[in-house]
Amino acid sequence: MNEKNIKHSQNFITSKHNIDKIMTNIRLNEHDNIFEIGSGKGHFTLELVKRCNFVTAIEIDHKLCKTTENKLVDHDNFQVLNKDILQFKFPKNQSYKIYGNIPYNISTDIIRKIVFDSIANEIYLIVEYGFAKRLLNTKRSLALLLMAEVDISILSMVPREYFHPKPKVNSSLIRLSRKKSRISHKDKQKYNYFVMKWVNKEYKKIFTKNQFNNSLKHAGIDDLNNISFEQFLSLFNSYKLFNK
């Protein structure tokens, strides 16, 4: 993702009143280390450094890096890295959380990056409301892949009036809470394959007719358009048994 395209997709929240309202839904304490995705003009960064042990802001726009550094000149518990989040290597040997008001047009890429390439125990993101709903939709491949690794919650609405420039749609604050992976390391490739075939309704490529009917019955599924993640895991476990 080049710098020009990312800058054109950025919408900033600058009102301290609105930022404080959002922050009430984010669990932070003075011991937390935070990686912030996109410092923007430093308005959220400033509130994060007041609440946390240390903040590392990752910002691709060189000018915004300087703006953030100038805004936080009275604080020393932060650093701003002029880097592309999609190329950033998160540490593997420390505890941290992630926060970001992320660009709509690369939300999928960013969320894949931070769930699968970081060990953050909690992730807070401001995303487009429709995107947030899709993350809870078990008919979507991204939702099924994420739900195996994190619990996903929509914490609050973020009205489009909070942003400058004002986008066409409302946003949501979401939380992704890390959990023990529901898929063993040796089964991850098999799970990815199963997810893609299921979402594309290529049932014949993963089950025979009898296997399919028995798997649905075992999972307690009456409606293919309305299944829970636990029911989906039951289907995957049946698939594994049939393909030992």
Curated annotation (Swiss-Prot):
Top-level taxonomic group: Bacteria
Tell me, using the record's free text, what induces this protein: By erythromycin.
Which GO CC terms are listed, alphabetically? Answer: cytosol
Binding, S-adenosyl-L-methionine = 11, 13, 38, 59, 84, 101
Tell whether RNA-binding is among the UniProt keywords. yes
Q: Which GO terms describe its biological process?
A: response to antibiotic
Q: Which Pfam families match?
A: RrnaAD
Show the PROSITE patterns listed in the entry. Answer: RRNA_A_DIMETH (PS01131), SAM_RNA_A_N6_MT (PS51689)
S-S bridge residues: none
Q: Which GO terms describe its molecular function?
A: 23S rRNA (adenine(2085)-N(6))-dimethyltransferase activity; RNA binding; rRNA (adenine-N6,N6-)-dimethyltransferase activity
UniProt KW keywords: Antibiotic resistance, Methyltransferase, Plasmid, RNA-binding, S-adenosyl-L-methionine, Transferase
Q: What is its EC number?
A: 2.1.1.184
Report the function annotation for this chain.
Answer: This protein produces a dimethylation of the adenine residue at position 2085 in 23S rRNA, resulting in reduced affinity between ribosomes and macrolide-lincosamide-streptogramin B antibiotics.
- The family this protein is said to belong to: Belongs to the class I-like SAM-binding methyltransferase superfamily. rRNA adenine N(6)-methyltransferase family.
Q: This protein is called what?
A: rRNA adenine N-6-methyltransferase
Q: Which organism is it from?
A: Staphylococcus aureus
- Identify the taxonomic lineage of the organism of origin: Bacteria, Bacillati, Bacillota, Bacilli, Bacillales
